[in-house]
């Protein structure tokens, strides 16, 4: 009799919590019990809504935690160096990454999520409500059309994206939203040397950080771009 292939069991919340705790410790990110709980609740929301809204190609909650949550947490020590209070815009946020993770891990920050797809904004608003994130806001529309003081409250200390667009395009589209002293941060896989070579005038790489994400065997880089007009 041929044995039927069994589907891998879905990881329990306890298993995910252990993975999250170990990963956050390895990244040097201090999380309270409430913050860990909120991140696990966020994974559950992603898994639930993903079936209908196709927010991510990753279906397994364990891989969601590694490839989305820990990946996003890996930038917290670098962005958090700005201080306990800052404003951030997550461009092309999709399912809320990395913005929702930043809002949970950096509760003193005011984080705005931006996407052009209404159903993704709907999920982001649902997550904001269910996770009780008072420091999170959502705006739908193309980033290049957003007006400080009208569509968004003002300019931002940090503008970040995760696999949103070519680095040069990202900078061109979002630079009008950078506050004085602020910068643009791009989460990338392999080192994007060709994209860096296409940066527009008045933009330059301030730092490029090689990231190591626990349990993830993949190359990751975080690029900070500074602008002449924001110095």
Curated annotation (Swiss-Prot):
Q: What's the source species' lineage?
A: Bacteria, Pseudomonadati, Pseudomonadota, Betaproteobacteria, Burkholderiales
Q: Which Pfam families match?
A: GidB
Q: Where in the cell is it found?
A: Cytoplasm
Gene3D superfamilies xref list = Vaccinia Virus protein VP39
Which positions does UniProt annotate for S-adenosyl-L-methionine binding?
A: 92, 97, 143-144, 162
Q: What does this protein do?
A: Specifically methylates the N7 position of guanine in position 527 of 16S rRNA.
Q: Give any GO molecular function from the UniProt entry.
A: rRNA (guanine-N7-)-methyltransferase activity
What's the domain of life for this entry?
Bacteria
What main location does UniProt list?
cytoplasm
* Similarity-based family: Belongs to the methyltransferase superfamily. RNA methyltransferase RsmG family.
The organism named in the record is: Burkholderia thailandensis (strain ATCC 700388 / DSM 13276 / CCUG 48851 / CIP 106301 / E264)
Q: Which reaction does it catalyse?
A: guanosine(527) in 16S rRNA + S-adenosyl-L-methionine = N(7)-methylguanosine(527) in 16S rRNA + S-adenosyl-L-homocysteine
This chain belongs to the protein called: Ribosomal RNA small subunit methyltransferase G
Q: Does the keyword Lyase apply?
A: no
In short, the EC number is 2.1.1.170
Record's GO cellular component terms: cytosol
Which UniProt keywords are present, listed alphabetically? Cytoplasm, Methyltransferase, rRNA processing, S-adenosyl-L-methionine, Transferase
């Amino acid at each position: 009799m041929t044995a039927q292939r069994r589907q891998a069991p879905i990881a329990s919340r306890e298993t995910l919590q252990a993975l999250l705790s170990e990963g956050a410790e390895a990244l040097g990110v201090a999380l309270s019990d409430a913050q860990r709980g909120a991140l696990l609740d966020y994974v559950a929301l992603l898994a639930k809504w993903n079936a209908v809204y196709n927010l991510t190609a990753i279906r397994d909650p364990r891989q969601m935690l590694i490839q989305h949550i820990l990946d996003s947490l890996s930038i917290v020590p670098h962005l958090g160096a700005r201080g306990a209070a800052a404003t951030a815009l997550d461009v092309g946020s999709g399912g809320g990454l990395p913005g929702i993770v930043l809002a949970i891990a950096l509760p003193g920050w005011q984080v705005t999520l931006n996407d052009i797809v209404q159903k993704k904004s709907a999920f982001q608003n649902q997550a904001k409500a269910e996770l009780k994130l008072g420091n999170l806001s959502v705006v739908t529309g193309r980033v290049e059309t957003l007006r400080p003081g009208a569509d968004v409250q003002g300019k931002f200390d940090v503008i970040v994206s995760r696999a949103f667009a070519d680095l040069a395009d990202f900078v061109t589209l979002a630079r009008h939203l950078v506050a004085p002293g602020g910068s643009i941060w791009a989460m990338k896989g392999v080192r994007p040397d060709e994209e860096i070579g296409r940066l527009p005038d008045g933009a330059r790489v301030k730092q490029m950080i090689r990231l190591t994400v626990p349990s993830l065997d993949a190359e990751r880089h975080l690029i900070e771009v500074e602008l002449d007009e924001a110095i």
